[in-house]
Design a protein with these regions (language model features):
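Nucleic-acid enzyme cleavage-core boundary/entry regions
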Residues: 1-98, 110, 116-194
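Acidic/Gly/His-enriched mid-domain segments of enzyme catalytic cores or analogous surface patches
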Residues: 106-108
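Terminal peptide-recognition signature
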Residues: 103
């Protein structure tokens, strides 16, 4: 298997198997936590899974680990990602097209931009998961980057289904309670983790 460094890998939890041109496979199903290199994903011809859905999660250090721990039935393939890396794009390309994809990200402008970028490179529809703008108890003003990004997000056809959430943030001038971690730990019973 390839060496892992920087953004040249994808981190995941759940059943996954790489299929190579020579007919060989590498099954990661029994492992709880997996890093797969972009080089290995590029070499394989397809990726199979017995999971019923794919859930990509923006926050690798906390939220991803909490949801992986709650995924006891392993019916969800959980992948840590923010902006789509080459390894994540390879994984998306090689997973079955019929596998439903959900993305759980922060709800500040950068979080919505990540959802947009994932949708731009994904061969399947990506549904937002738990991504609802919530006003902050103490408003967090939009910064210069946010204000530059908002018009692009509001105009993006790929974000039409979440435009109301982005508009609420823009109208209030408030980034809101945007961090995933403020929603608390997921329910241990598995999908939908609530």
């Amino acid at each position: 298997m390839g060496l892992v460094a920087g953004d040249s890998h994808v981190e995941l939890h759940g059943p996954v198997c790489l299929h190579f041109p020579d007919g060989g496979t590498h099954d990661f199903d029994g492992l709880a936590h997996v890093l797969i290199s972009a080089a290995d994903l590029a070499r394989c011809v397809s990726v199979s899974t017995t999971a019923e859905r794919l859930l990509s999660i923006e926050n690798r250090k906390t939220t991803f680990r909490q949801y992986a721990a709650a995924n006891g039935d392993r019916r969800t393939l959980i992948v840590a990602t923010s902006f789509p890396t080459p390894a994540f794009r390879e994984l998306l390309e090689k997973l079955p097209r019929g596998l439903p994809h959900y993305h759980f990200g922060d709800t500040d402008p950068a979080g919505w931009q990540i959802l947009l970028k994932i949708r731009e490179v994904n061969p399947r529809r990506v549904e937002p998961f738990g991504m609802r703008w919530r006003p902050a108890a103490v408003p967090v003003p939009l910064n210069r980057f946010d204000l530059q990004l908002l018009p692009k997000l509001l105009d993006a056809p790929l974000l039409a289904d979440v435009r109301q959430e982005i508009s609420a943030m823009a109208a209030g001038g408030d980034r809101g309670d945007f961090e995933q971690e403020t929603l608390g730990r997921p329910a241990i019973e598995g999908w939908p983790f609530q």
